[in-house]
Structures are given as C-alpha cells and as structure tokens.
C-alpha cells in the first residue's frame, strides 16, 4: 500500500478497465471536486464503481473496494455546469483507508498483482478464440468495429485483450466488477469466453424468435388469403368441400373405436368444432391430431392372455440360467394373476389389485430380458419405457393440448403403438428418474403404479380417464434409491450377481451360440477350450452380471471372423495360451501379493449399484498429537463410522495397555479410488481393524475380508447385500469372510458354490473380529487381547437398523 492519497471518482453503470480510454460525464459535486483535485495534482484518481448505480449521493459503504487507477487525458466544463472528461485506466487497485471529508472521497491504494497462469501452448488459441467470439458478438449487435478488431489482433497480452473486450461489452455491472477483480489473466479470459458464449446464444435465440414471429405472421396472412379464395371458387362451382370426406371418415372411426360413452361424446363434440373450421387452419390440425390419438387408443382391444404355469416355467428356464428364487417368485405372481382372471373379479364389481413387480439388481443380470420372458409366457405384447434421466412430468401424464407440438404421455403412446390395452410394459431404470421445475415424474408414476387408482389414470392430452389396470407393469432398478411412496407401491424382487460357475454356464448356453449366430460362424469354425471362459471372467470382466462377458466373447468372435476371412486359418480354437492374442493384456491381475498380510491394510466389502465390491482400507499411524485424518471421498455416515471405530480402538488399547499414549500418534485412514464416492456404516469393523493394526504395528491377514457395522461398545450389527458382498469376495479369491452373526439367516440364500469357496465366520463382537483378523505370527498379541475385554455400560440403548456400504 502506498502512502499517497488519491481522490475517488464514484462511477454509475461504468467500469473502467486498464489500458482503456473512456469518456465520462460528471455532474455530482463530489465527483467534480475529485476531478479538480486530480487536475491540480498528478492528474491521477481512483475510478471506483458503485454497488448500486441508482444511489445518487453515495457513501463509502456504497463503493466497491476494487477499482482502477485512472489518468485524466482531457477535461472540459460544459455550459450546464457538468464536466466531460476523458480518462484512461492504468491498472487494477484495491482501496485502503477510505475517507470522506464531505467535499470528496479519497483513499490510499494497493496495486493488485497482475498474474498469468496461461500455459504457453494455449496462449495463441485463447487469443484467437477471444477475438473470434468478440467479432461474432459485434456482428450480432450490428456494430462495426474493424479498427478495434485490428487493434486487438496486434496485442499479444491475454490480460490486456480481455480488458479491452470487456470494456466494449454490455454486461451487467456485477459481471464487469467481477472481471475487474480477477487478477489472473488466464482466469479472466476463461470467464470472458463463457460470457461471450452466453451473449452469442442469447442473440441467436432472439433472432430465431423474431424470424419465427415474422414467418408466422406471413403464414397466417397467406392462409387467410388462400382460404378466402378457395371458398369463393367452391361457391362458384358448387362443389363439396374435400375436407368433408375426411370428417366423415373420422366420424366412422370414432364410432368403430368402441370408446366409453363419455369419451365418444367428447370426440363427437370436437368433431363438430372441426366441421366449422377451415381445413387449413392451425387449430383444425390440433383437433384432428387429438381425434386421431383418441381413435388409435385401444379402448376395447384386449389381447387374450394365457396363464400356463408350466409353459411359463419352460420359457423362464429357456431364457435364463439360475435365478431360481426369482423364477419361483415370478411364477407365484403369474399364479395369482391366473386365479384373479378365473374368478373374473372385474365383472363382480371389484378390481384385482395385483402387486407391481420391481426387479432390482446390478447391470447385466437379466432384468430387462426377464420382462420380455414374462410377456412371452403370458402371450402379451411387450415394450419398454426408459425412465433414466426423465425429468418432465409431462412425459408420463402428457402435455396440455394448448402447447405447440403437444403429445400424450409415454404410456398412452406405447399402448397406441402396441394396439392392445393389456401389454407388459417395462419401466426401465426407475431409480434414475430426475425432477426439476417441470415437475416430478416419480410423483406422476404413483397413480400409474397404484392398482387402486390406475383404472382412472388421467392423461393431460387426452383429457379423459383411461384404464391401466389391465397393463402389467414391471419396473427395473439398480438400487433402492427410489422415493418411499413409489417403492411402497411395488414388490421388490432382488436379482443378485452370478457366481463364476453360473457365468460359465450362461456363456456356454446363451452367449457363445448367440455370438456365433450374429457373426455367422459355424460351431466347427469357432471353438472355445475348457478353462478359457473362466480366464475371461477372472481376468477381463469381474462384474456382477454378464454384460462385459458378452462383449469380450463378441470380441473373440469378431477377431476369429477376421482371421477366417483373411484365409490364415480354416477354424479357430481359443485356448488359455492364445487368449491374450485375441483380448490383449488382462485387465485384472490375480496377484498373490495382494493376499499377503500387511500392517494397516484391511479388505472390507461394499454393496453398490453394480453389485458387490472389495473395499480396500489403508491406515498408518505416526508421531503426532492424536489427530485423525480420513480421505477417499467419504460420505457423512462413513465418517461417523470411522469416529466410532476410533473410539472403540482407543478404549481397547487403553484397557490393553495402561501406558499407551494415543495423543502421541496421528492417524491417517484412506480408502483408495478417491474419485469414487463411498458411504455407509457396514465397513465399521474393517475400519476398527485397520486402526488397531496401524497403532499396534500388527499385520492383518491379506486373504480375509470383513463386513459389519460397529457400535460404540464393540457389538457387530447386521448389514445388507450379503450375497453380493460374498460374491465379490469369491471373485477376489479371498479365503475367509467375517460377517455379523445376525446375518447367519441370510446364508440360506447363498449358493453352495460360494459357501464352499469361502470360510464364512460369524462374529458378534469386535473381540472375535480381532481374533481372526491378525496373523498367527502375532499370537502373543492376540493372547493379550483375549485376556482383556471392553468395559460395558449397564444402560440398554436401542440401535438403529444397519444401512449398507
């Protein structure tokens, strides 16, 4: 900061940038006094924008703390007492020690350091883009500034170019002050590019609107002239209006469509309106489209549905391997529907309220194909509606007819397309519905998926109730991240991931034959040796489903086709030895070092939208002051779990060793893959084990994984997603998994193959976790642990249900 005091010239609606000369008209007394003071001195003054341009008599609080040091180039007093001045901005300044002596404002300045973080290789490109976008802006504004553009092309300083352009733009005062406050020329140029792009987009939109309005006016005048001319010709010739034939056809179709009485009445009313209109008018087209949608809707067209349970079981077994629990639940559902149909509840005056199925599981486990199989088993039509990213309620309920280009909702559109009112409609990715100011599609689906209400579903476009109770809706999702009211209307059926042996059988029975067919390969031309599929699964996919497995087998088939076409071989045999030649280097390595015992390294288990995953937890302890650091993009619940685990371990170590000083150590806990968000409480025992290992310098078994929520007293609580987590442990070639004792009941759902591959140990307390986690070489340490027990508290506390990690 300099000691020199400069007069302040408050500016309204003007920001003076460095290296830019700006004309100013000054009429306020304090402003004129500031000009006079500058002229009597060094001709320099502080050019400071006001926070609110509407303030006529500003105070110091009304001024920004950022401005420009300016130099008066020229000044002239006008006859009305005002002053015209030409000022040049010199450089950015920060105001210090502001003062108001009633005559004028004054302040000291601190020069703002001009920085430039632009990479040298980007410099020329940024300059070119800035000038090009500015030229485009000037053209849109119909302003001629060839001389200014030539001047800019002669400047090689990004900061100066940005300031010059900003000075000639019509930005809001806040944006200009923001640009003035930015010391880094590179950041200033990036912000300016965004503002220029926004201005260009706004100008283009204005042009489109003007052109559209102009064209509409011309079109309306032309239509009016032609309609009047046609009427005159028809009157002279006495011919019938050609549109009459279309109206008669529409009337016949309305009567043939077997609409409900109230709907047919409304359709005929709209038809009468159409008769009174010119066929060329825009409103006539709106009514005609509306009537066509009413006619196309299958009001009374119901495809005969069959409920042959044996045939349904055959189709499900044909199309899907495994998933026995899922198939059984689907057959139960079809049996109930068959019984409802046999008792003909609708004719008895009641409505069958069969549940809506929601298939939940990771990608590639067969949710969509199960929907197709159900449709085939029941003899119904099938279609799917992709809900992922849907954010407009009108996509479900339809648009009001008053909107240009209005259409019915997706459900009505699908029913019109299929031509029957009892199809199977798959609502795909229901957990990925969005919502914004257009409404909430999930709320609109509440009526669609409620069997007690969907017989009177109202589509905004059709403006009438339609019966959706005959439609069999099946929803799919990767997670239970669905609104509670919507989830309450559906029965959830989980599709867990496949075991390795199940994937091998799926590949042999479905994927390999399908890839042979798609790539026109004979069985004798394309063979896969035993063991190859296992290598593909272990080294190239590692997923809960089989989607990537199909991609890799497809890659094998395509490369085989190429070799056959080149004439190098007459048949291709894929073996473990030549697999790398077809698929390249393995994406996942089976490294025995990962299974070695390490200090502070523990393998947890996570349950995600794509199935189970291994969760690596690393901890280190070093000299410090008892501070805890955790990294890896952890959610709030997981951070609380870490703090709980730390309290358990501190209590444990205090009880184990009275001389242990926790405040002499700092601890850093890290979960790798920091770009991936992680949350949930079920890694609690893994966190505690990692912390104890880091503090005690004792190694943890590398072939062991664990999952379970921990309480402050060391109790291990139940978790969710056990099957998915055990499948992940099997894929990771681990030998032992510690699970909460309360989850023992869930082992009945675990495939025998998984239980045979893993030693699954139930634990109820952190003592038991430590007993199994630390390697046998540290038996003395384990013995000391066994002799101690955590202090207990007599009060009984209710624990919340475990979440999932």
UniProtKB/Swiss-Prot annotation:
Its main location: cytoplasm. One of its GO terms (molecular function) is serine-type endopeptidase activity. Homohexamer. Organized in a ring with a central cavity. Belongs to the peptidase S16 family. Induction: By heat shock. One of its GO terms (cellular component) is cytoplasm. This is Lon protease. InterPro entries: AAA+_ATPase, ATPase_AAA_core, Lon_bac, Lon_bac/euk-typ, Lon_lid, Lon_proteolytic, Lon_Prtase, Lon_prtase_N. Its EC number is 3.4.21.53. It is found in: Cytoplasm. The keyword Mitochondrion does not apply. It holds the Pfam family Lon_C. The active site is at 682, 725. SMART domains: AAA, LON.
């Amino acid at each position: 900061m300099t000691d020199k005091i400069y007069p302040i010239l408050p500016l309204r609606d003007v920001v003076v940038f460095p290296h830019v000369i700006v004309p100013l008209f000054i009429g306020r007394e304090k402003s004129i006094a500031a000009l006079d003071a500058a002229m009597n001195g060094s001709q320099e003054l502080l050019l400071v924008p006001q926070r609110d341009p509407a303030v006529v008599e500003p105070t110091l609080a009304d001024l920004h703390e950022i401005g420009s040091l300016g130099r008066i180039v020229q000044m002239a007093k006008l006859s009305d007492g005002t002053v015209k001045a030409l000022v040049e901005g010199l450089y950015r300044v920060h105001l210090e020690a502001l003062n108001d002596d009633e005559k004028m404002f004054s302040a000291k300045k601190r020069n703002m350091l001009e920085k430039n973080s632009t990479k040298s290789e980007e410099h020329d490109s940024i300059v070119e883009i800035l000038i090009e976008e500015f030229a485009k802006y000037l053209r849109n504004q119909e302003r001629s500034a060839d001389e200014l553009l030539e001047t800019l092309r002669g400047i090689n300083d990004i900061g100066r170019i940005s300031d010059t352009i900003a000075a000639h733009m019509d930005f809001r005062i806040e944006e200009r002050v923001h640009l003035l406050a930015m010391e880094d020329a590179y950041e200033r140029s990036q912000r300016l590019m965004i503002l220029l792009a926004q201005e260009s987009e706004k100008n283009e939109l204005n042009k489109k609107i003007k052109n559209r309005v102009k064209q509409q006016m011309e079109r309306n005048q032309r239509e009016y002239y032609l309609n009047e001319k046609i009427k005159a010709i028809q009157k002279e010739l006495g011919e019938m209006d050609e549109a009459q034939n279309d109206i008669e056809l529409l009337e016949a179709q309305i009567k043939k469509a077997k609409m409900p009485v109230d709907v047919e009445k409304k359709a005929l009313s709209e038809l009468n309106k159409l008769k009174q209109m010119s066929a060329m008018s825009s409103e006539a087209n709106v009514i005609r489209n509306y009537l066509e949608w009413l006619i196309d809707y299958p009001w009374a067209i119901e495809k005969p549905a069959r409920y042959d349970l044996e045939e349904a079981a055959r189709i499900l077994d044909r199309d899907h391997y495994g998933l026995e629990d899922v198939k059984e639940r689907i057959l139960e559902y079809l049996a109930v529907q068959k019984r409802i149909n046999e008792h003909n509840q609708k004719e008895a005056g009641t409505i069958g309220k069969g549940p809506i199925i929601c298939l939940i599981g990771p990608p590639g486990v067969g949710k969509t194909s199960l929907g197709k199989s159900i449709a085939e088993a029941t003899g119904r039509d099938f279609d799917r509606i992709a809900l992922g990213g849907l954010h407009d309620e009108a996509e479900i309920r339809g648009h009001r007819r008053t909107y240009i280009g209005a259409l019915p909702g997706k459900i009505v559109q699908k029913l019109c397309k299929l031509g029957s009112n009892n199809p199977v409609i798959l609502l795909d990715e229901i957990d990925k519905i969005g919502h914004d100011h257009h409404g909430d599609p999930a709320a609109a689906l509440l009526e669609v998926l409620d069997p007690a209400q969907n017989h009177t579903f109202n589509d905004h476009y059709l403006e009438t109730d339609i019966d959706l109770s005959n439609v069999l809706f099946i929803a799919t999702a990767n997670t239970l991240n669905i609104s509670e009211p919507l989830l309450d209307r559906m029965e959830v059926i989980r599709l867990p991931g496949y075991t390795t042996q199940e994937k091998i059988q799926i590949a042999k029975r479905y994927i390999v034959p399908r890839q042979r067919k798609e790539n026109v390969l004979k069985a004798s031309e394309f063979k896969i040796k035993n063991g190859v599929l296992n290598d593909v699964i272990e080294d190239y996919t590692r997923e809960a489903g089989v989607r990537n497995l199909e991609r890799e087998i497809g890659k094998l088939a395509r490369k085989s086709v190429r070799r056959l076409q080149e004439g190098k071989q007459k048949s291709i045999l894929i073996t473990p030895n030549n697999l790398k030649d077809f698929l390249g280097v393995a994406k996942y390595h089976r490294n025995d070092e990962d299974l070695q015992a390490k200090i502070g390294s523990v393998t947890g288990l996570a349950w995600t939208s794509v199935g189970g995953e291994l969760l690596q937890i690393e901890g280190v302890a070093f000299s410090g002051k008892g501070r805890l650091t955790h990294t890896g993009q952890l959610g709030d619940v997981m951070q609380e779990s870490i703090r709980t685990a730390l309290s358990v371990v501190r209590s444990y170590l205090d009880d184990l060793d009275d001389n242990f000083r926790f405040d002499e150590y700092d601890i850093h806990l890290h979960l790798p893959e920091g770009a991936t968000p992680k949350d949930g409480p079920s890694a609690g025992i893994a966190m505690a084990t990692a912390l104890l290992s880091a503090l005690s310098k004792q190694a943890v078994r590398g072939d062991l994984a664990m999952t379970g929520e921990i309480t402050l007293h060391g109790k291990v609580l139940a978790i969710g997603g056990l099957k998915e987590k055990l499948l992940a442990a099997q894929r990771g070639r681990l030998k032992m998994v510690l699970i909460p004792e309360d989850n023992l009941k869930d082992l009945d759902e675990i495939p025998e193959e998984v239980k045979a591959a893993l030693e699954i140990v139930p634990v109820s307390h952190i003592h038991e976790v430590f007993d199994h986690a630390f390697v046998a070489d540290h038996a003395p340490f384990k013995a000391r642990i066994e002799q101690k027990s955590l202090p207990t508290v007599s009060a009984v506390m209710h624990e919340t249900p475990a979440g999932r990690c």
